[in-house]
Structures are given as structure tokens and as C-alpha cells.
Amino acid sequence: MKDWTNYQNKTYGDDACKLIIDFLDKYKVDSAIDLGCGSGNETVYMVKNGIKVLAIDRQLNQDFILNRLSDSEKQLISFNESSFEDVELPKTKLLTAFFSIPFCNPNNFDELWTKIYNSIEDNGYFVGQLFGDRDAWNVVESINTFSIDKVKEYLKNYNIIKLEEIEYVRESDNKKWHFYDIIAQKKVCDKHE
């Protein structure tokens, strides 16, 4: 298991991902799951916007989140320390996964994606990222990367609100990034199928 402590320390207190900020500017939800919450920046942002959040991470640092919340805001947060491979997901209106689920064991990714789908209520939302197949990490066997066609296949039971392909080289370490920003609304199931 990779130790995420350094990453969490490095990203603690960063601004929330623009994707969740943009989403919450347009859509209202009352509950969310932040899957792979890391240092909790998006979790804190959602709670501060009045959303009840279940924060899940395999290496959960609750203090990183709780230290940034008022006593009343702390009533909106719950935690679950679990790996992607073992996680159980309750029903929710919004499931977020910011640069997290590509780190699921590749042998378990399809199962995780099914759990995510089953967790999201009809007309609920998935907001997050998947790594593209031209990302520098595409050669790392333990990391999931996807072609645009594969991403669209994963989203076939969703109405795609945003699917933006982003590709650049980060100057600080010359790492090639290729990922997809996703906002998708789960289609209503036809009970007669």
C-alpha cells in the first residue's frame, strides 16, 4: 500500500478543485460522498456549502478536515477509512472522486465503478477525474488510465454534462498530465427493463 501522508501534507489547505466549485455554482445537492478525500479540501468546501458529506479514504486524516470546520459544520461530516477495493458505498445524491479512483487496483476498477453507479441516486451526479492514456503514469501498472472512448463507455448510463480532456506538462517536475474532468448525471432507471 502506498503511503499518502506526504501527499496529504503537501496538499492540506489547498483550494478546492475548480470542478466542484463550478458544479456547486450550478447544482444543489444535500448529500455527498467524497471518495478518496485525501487532505479533505473538497470535503471541507462541500461542508461549508451546507452539504452532508461522507469522507472516505484508505489513509484517513480526520484532523485535516475537522480542524477547518466549525462545531456546527462538524455535524455535517462523517468518515469511513476504507480502500477502494473494500469500500461499501451508501446511496447519495453526489459522489465525488478528485484524482483518486485511478489509484484503485486495476483488477478491481470495474467493480468499483459499478459500486459508484449503484451508490448514486437516480438523477444524482458523479463529479471527478479519470486519468487519460497519454498521462505519464500510463506505464505504471497499478494506475488506471483510459482512452476517451473507454471513459465514454463508463459514462453510458449517465447524461454527460461536462467531459473535458486536459493535457499539459507541469513545469515544476516536467510530469505529463492527461486527464478528463467529468460531471455526469445518472440517468433515471426504467423500472420496466
Model-found features: residue ranges?
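Class I (Rossmann-like) S-adenosyl-L-methionine-dependent methyltransferase catalytic domain
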Residues: 1-28, 38-88, 107-111, 125-193
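A conserved beta-strand element that flanks and buttresses the S-adenosyl-L-methionine
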Residues: 96
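Conserved acidic residues
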Residues: 30, 93
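Conserved beta-strand/loop positions that form the S-adenosyl-L-methionine
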Residues: 35
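ABC ATPase nucleotide-binding domain "signature" loop
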Residues: 103
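A short glycine-rich, Lys/Arg-flanked "PGG" loop and its adjoining helix->strand segment in the class I
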Residues: 110-122
